[in-house]
Amino acid sequence: MRIALAQILSGTEPSANLRLVADYARRAADEGAKLVVFPEATMCRFGVPLAAIAEPITGPWADGVRGIAAQAGITVAAGMFVPAADGRVTNTVIATGPGVDTHYDKIHLYDAFGFTESRIVVPGQEPVVIDLDGVGVGLTTCYDIRFPELYTELARRGAKLITVSASWGSGRGKLDQWTLLARARALDSTSFIAATDQAHPRGTLPGSAAPTGVGGSLVASPLGEVLASAGSDPELVVTDIAVDSVAAARDTIAVLRNRSEFAQIDEAESRG
């Protein structure tokens, strides 16, 4: 299966960001990719009031993504924000394309490193796996990557490829953590990991504590190998993954087969 990572740099205007989705999705499709993974906050970067730009999953921005995916003939996974009942939003990944139209709400909120996402975001409750040409694809978002039990649960539900849409916070050692965590989750779940971050804004947002990306998007194999990666600037990464190799990796490492049943996901709670 050929997949693509669209490492873009989102701005604050959803319509401009939608044009980026159209451009990168078309380019990914032209290179033969079946799936293109965009970052968290593709709709609008962090650091601005999100409730003001949030739209329903049936709204014009999401419909724009659906139209782009349909026209290009590719499945698109992209981060957006959806209004919640209490005035906050959900941090949502829309996944849409041929035979696919669903969404995932981020379960683990980024109440860490001095940022409190739960002030503005309501947590999701349910892991999501989509079917892409017979391949199970799990959907996750950014801070989720620090919680291995979600990834093993997605594998248990049939995922052989797990996407991570991120807007990673910058800081000392954070890029190394991002790369390490992606490879570790590949090993935990013995799945391919397609991890797409926002490109690094390179000092264009002085004084902002919001997580706005460090780049370093990558694809990791079920054995934790980095198969393809990006630098810090906007970039489209296209690579092939051998989905059939997942079974052999799971037989060899056997962490899913030998896993103790004490580790379960029962619920997700906001700490805000």
Positions of predicted regions on the chain:
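CN hydrolase (nitrilase-like) catalytic-core segments centered on the catalytic cysteine
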Residues: 58-77, 145-235
